[in-house]
Structures are given as structure tokens and as C-alpha cells.
């Protein structure tokens, strides 16, 4: 059998053993706990002296400091480059988490190695020393087991029915001398032969302190047994929990304590209550303290871990994937810790609804409790729903949490002014204020899927909350009082109303406070960039007056955009120095992420697809744009006789074409406005991706006009310079509707001929929407739907007609795309773009 196979087999057997043991323990515990009277347990808890309860929790929190001695010994032995205070803090965090998710101490050993490997060059010695610390968890119990064997601690009442327990104690007791002798003969470091002895002493003290916390919790609930007997039961229970490999010994430890004390005729309700207090005081409370310490301890650790490490310098040079992920994980520890604290707080205070409602049942003024319990539930729900937002360091989510904690504090102070709960809320409030200043983003981007998930989650939580309250009151036999006083009749609806009001106010305030800047209309800078680096097909639309401009720090590149509904919608590709496009978009995306906005690109070319892809985008083909090569364009030949016929017909009528240069006379503006209004009729102007009839906009470029035989303007088109590779385009094409002549054809033909005569090389006729989109069965689903629209909805919008019309000029078709974030809906993105095109606000 190979070494690898043996390792796999051992792992499988270990997991099978743990699962089997856990199943047996769970079944046995269920049978034992089924006899517990919940009502009696709650009454017993209500009688506990609050001073002693606070003292118990403080003792549990302080007891973990003993475990930090392991880390101090580790640091001194290996001469780690780390201060004493920091060693104690990290030791506290590691040991508190290890107590809950230890798996026999292996998790704690792994975390220790991760934290300390950057402080020493000798990783092998670090690994072996941590192994000594791991094994010493058992040697401490072995030391205490010797005291059981020599009858200092008495568990004879267990030895009698279970004689094998006695032999187990002998075996465990023998482990200590073997371990001590081995570590002295083969030490990790020859200068520290007594390392195993030191760790064993610390382990023994650790287990003894844990026993004192459990003994104190039992004494608080009225369990009075000789300390020597109690210690014997505790040692056996701790040994069972350690061997089980179940995190924290949950279930196994508790079952042995329950059976051991029950054999001494101790009340079951008191045992369960004492064990619960012990679990909260010795396990949960230190974890909460560790999470609080984590929010401060690892704030700058990631940066130092990455930048100051001699070991990681070559890793950085190789851009190590593993190293970068380690950096990210460490940097995320503080936000993850505060998120867990908020999750715990919300769940605990949801249970506090029971206390508030219970008080209200016996209060003559029930209506006050309608409001209090609704506010309390609303705050707990908002706190829970914003856990992920706080983890993402969203300022808005943190503000939601701050307000929620304030509401919970007020409700708790008014109804059940527990010193412990109010102190805890104060700590959470202070932490949230600290994180509010550290917030990385204003808010997260809005998604309808997130909204739906929040609504469903909120509804499920409220329903579970109702079931817990209902089942608890039935168990306490007081539900009939609730039915008579109807304290919960309007509870749900008041909660929903309060959630809606709070969410609405905060969302409105953030939208008002952090609305996109209105000062980005520096056209002069954009003009200078275009003069130096050229523009693109859409750059002339910067004069339309409905766009803002994001210009990079070097002032050599910019994008045109509109803000709409938490989204920056960018028109076309970036403009300017192509070498600056990446840094330009990086800065723009950082701003959008900070403000919680999405980014959509509309009508981009395929030239910069790799650039857009690098920012996590996906693409949808909008259609194709017709570009005519003017060097080969002609109206001669048999195939072009239709074009010649159009020109000849208007020439015979005495019509003429002329290109006018700005500035234009007021009379000309008035005449053009009349034609534009007639052409629009009852339709509205479109915006953003096309120009509109605005005196300032049309005065920025020449205008081609078609005049009748009386020299009156009957049609016009606005030129659209691109400042790009000899390309010109037209924007507005409008004519009098009462003249039944091919005026649009005439305008296009005359513009093509004029452009060719003026040495332009290409003429852009604009986009045929949805043209050549989704025409093969392997296209994306959304594109295939768009293709069907192109084929079958010609009566609704002339998709096919536009392409057929432009085809007669024999253009080259260039694709245009919509670019949007990977997790954003295509249809929502399209609707946002349509909105800014249809509305000028």
C-alpha cells in the first residue's frame, strides 16, 4: 500500500468515525433533551442574577487569554519578529476561532502557520513547533487524567457502570510521560528541550480554567456538586469532545456532561441551561471578541504582508496567484468579521421579540407595543438584509445598519433594559461608525434580482419569526392571551410599512447626496483632444448639450456619457490617445463602483473589444453601420440609373443643392426650424445617439440644403464631421412632408457627391438597427430573439427597410455593439439606453 493511499484511507476512516460518532451523539442527545421542559428552563433563566451572568461572560472572554500563552511561547522559542501585544491579540483570535471550528485543533494550527510564516525564515521549525502546540492539547488532558487515576478527581459513579472508562483514563494518563520524554530527547530546537513541558503546563491550565467557567455556569443555575467530582466529569467530557474531531466538541462534550451529572440526580433543565450558558460564555462570547479584534488587527496587515515580506518578494515578481489570493483574504478579514457580528446581532435580537411581546401581553397599553415590536423587527430585518452590503463596505448598507442598531437600542432600553445587550449594541454601533469612515463604495449597483432576493428573504425571515413566536407562546401556554389582546394583529403590516419608509428615505437621501457631478461639460478640453488625436463617428455629438464628459488626468482621452437610473451610459468608443484608454476606463470604472453605478457602452465598434472584455463586460450586437467608400462611389453605370434619375428629376424642376457654412442667419434658422417641426409632426425629438434640432448644435457644422425653383429651402441635412480618417456623416435629414418628391434620396446623393468633391474618403450613412443579428442557430439567445424581431416586426419599426434602402449605395457594413456588465440584464440595459434616447432629461 502506497503512502498516498494510506493517507487517503486514514482520512476516509477519520471522517467516517466522526460522522458515526456525531450520529450516535445526536440521537442520544435528542432522546435526553426530549424530556426537557422549555417553560421551566425559561423561568430558571429569568431568575438568574444579572451580576453573576455578566461575571460569567467576562470570565469566559478572559479565559481565552490563557491560550495566548501558546503563541507567546511560540514567538519566544522561534524568535519571531512580532511584538508581545500583537502576539497576544493574534493568539486570542486564533484560539477563539479554533475553539469553535477546531476539528481537533487542526484549523487553529493551519491558521497559526498562515499568520506566523511571514515572521520567520525557518518554516520547518515553525511547522514542528505548531505541531507540539497541537499535540499538547491532549497532554494537558493527560496531566489532568493522572489526577483522576490517583483519585484526586472522583468519577467512581461512572467507573462502576462503565469500567472501560477507567482503562481509557489510564491510557490517556500514560500519554503524558511518553510525550515529555520524546520532546526532550528529540526537541524542535536543541536550546529549547523543555518546550513540550511548557506547552503541557499551559494546556493543563487551559483545561482547568475552562472547567472553572463551566462550574461557575452550573453554580449560577443552582447545580451544587463537589468540585472534585465535577472535575472528573469535565475531564472525561473534554476527552470525548477532543477525540470526536467535532468542532468544539459540540454534542459529544455536552452529552457526557449531561449523563455524568444526571447520574448524580441533578435536574436536567438546570444541566441544559448551565451547558448553554457555558457555550455562550466560553465559546460564542470569545468569538465575538475575536471578530471585534479582527476588524482592527487586519486593517493594514494585508499591505504589510504583501509589501514587507522578504519571503514573498519573489512571489510578487512571479505574480503568484496563490499569494494574491492570500493577500485578498487577509484584507477581507475585518469586513468579514463585522458582517458576522451583524448577522449574530440580528438573529439574537430577533429572539428578543419574544421578550417585547411577552411584556406587552401584560401591559395595559398594548398599542405602544404594536409600534415597539414593529420597529424592533424592522430594524433586525434591515440589519440582516444589509450584512452582505456591509461586507462589501457599502456606505449605504453601513448607514442602514447604524440606524437599525439605534432602533434596536431604543426598543431594548424601553422594554428589556439588559446591561449586556445594551453594551453589546454600543460596541456594534461604535464599530459601524468606524467602518462608515472606511467605506469603500457609496452603494452597490442595483439589480432587480437582488431586490427580488431581498423581498423573498425578508418575507421568509418574517414568517419564521412569526412561527418562532407562535410556537414559543404555545409551549409557554400563553398564546390564548395573545389572541385576546391581539398584540400581533397589525404587527406584520406595521413592520412592512416601517421598512418601506426607512428604505425609501435612506435611498432618496443617498441619491440626492451623491448624485453624479454636473460640472463635466468642458467641451474646450475635448476639442483640444480631438484636434490632436482625431475623433470618431460619434464625436461631433459632444455639441448636442445632453452629455457629460469624463476626461482622464493627462487630458488626452475622454468618453461622452449620460447618467440615468444609477447607470453611466457611454456613447461610442473612447476618444483621444488610444494608449490612455485603459487608464481612462479604469478611473471611470472606479468612480462608478464607488458610486454604485453600472456602466453601459452604446454603439461601440469591434476595434476595442479586448479592452471592454478586460473590464468584465459582455456584448450584444446592435446592428451594422453603413460606410460608403467615396473613392469608388459613382452614379454612372447601368445599376445606378435609378440614382441618376432622382438627380435629373430634381434638376429638371429647377431644384438646387447647396452646403452652407456657419454662422447662419436668424432667418435661415427660422426656415429650418419650420421644416423640422413639419417633419416631426406629432413625434418627439430623439437624443443622445443622434442630434436634435437645437440652434447651438446645428451651428457647429455646415448644413446641406435643398432649394426649390424659387430658392426656398424645402429640405436640409446637418453634416456631422468625425475628424477621423477622412470620414464624414450626416445627422438630421428633414424635409417638407407635403412635397411628394424623393427628397431624402436627393439629399443623400448630393451629400455623397459633395463629400467626394471635397476629398472625403468615406461617408457614414448610420446604423441599420438589428441588421445581421442572430442569423445563425449558434448565436446567443438574446441575439436570436433580436433577429426574429428584425425579420417579423418590419411593420412596427422599419428594420429591414432601413437596411434595404442603404444597400442601394453599396456600403461596407461595420458591426456596432452594446457593451454591459456580465451580471447585468441585457433587456434592462437596452431599456436604459432607449430611455436616454427617447427623453432629454
Swiss-Prot record:
Which positions, given as ranges, span the membrane? 9-29, 53-73, 90-110, 130-150, 165-185, 194-216, 230-250, 271-291, 337-357, 368-388, 393-413, 416-436, 449-469, 490-510
**What are the GO MF terms of this UniProt record?**
phosphatidylglycerol lysyltransferase activity
The answer to whether keyword Glycoprotein applies is: no
Please give the catalytic activity noted in the UniProt record. L-lysyl-tRNA(Lys) + a 1,2-diacyl-sn-glycero-3-phospho-(1'-sn-glycerol) = a 1,2-diacyl-sn-glycero-3-phospho-1'-(3'-O-L-lysyl)-sn-glycerol + tRNA(Lys)
Mind naming one GO cellular-component term on file for this protein? plasma membrane
Q: Does the keyword Aminoacyl-tRNA synthetase apply?
A: no
What top-level class of enzyme does the UniProt entry assign?
Answer: transferase
What EC number(s) has UniProt assigned to this enzyme?
Answer: 2.3.2.3
Q: Which InterPro entries match?
A: Acyl_CoA_acyltransferase, L-PG_synthase/AglD, LPG_synthase_C, PG_lysyltransferase
Q: Which domain of life is it from?
A: Bacteria
User: Which keywords accompany this UniProt record?
Assistant: Antibiotic resistance, Cell membrane, Lipid metabolism, Membrane, Transferase, Transmembrane, Transmembrane helix, Virulence
GO BP terms, alphabetized: lipid metabolic process; phospholipid homeostasis; response to antibiotic
Residue ranges that the UniProt entry lists as topological domain Extracellular: 30-52, 111-129, 186-193, 251-270, 358-367, 414-415, 470-489
Segments in the Cytoplasmic topological domain: 1-8, 74-89, 151-164, 217-229, 292-336, 389-392, 437-448, 511-841
**What SUPFAM superfamilies does the database record attribute to this sequence?**
Acyl-CoA N-acyltransferases (Nat)
Compartment(s) where it occurs, according to its Swiss-Prot or TrEMBL record? Cell membrane
| Membrane-protein topology | Multi-pass membrane protein
NCBIfam families reported in the protein's UniProt record: bifunc_MprF
Q: What does this protein do?
A: Catalyzes the transfer of a lysyl group from L-lysyl-tRNA(Lys) to membrane-bound phosphatidylglycerol (PG), which produces lysylphosphatidylglycerol (LPG), a major component of the bacterial membrane with a positive net charge. LPG synthesis contributes to bacterial virulence as it is involved in the resistance mechanism against cationic antimicrobial peptides (CAMP) produces by the host's immune system (defensins, cathelicidins) and by the competing microorganisms (bacteriocins).
The entry sums up its family as follows: Belongs to the LPG synthase family.
Protein's name according to its UniProt entry = Phosphatidylglycerol lysyltransferase
Species source reads Staphylococcus xylosus
Q: Which gene encodes it?
A: mprF
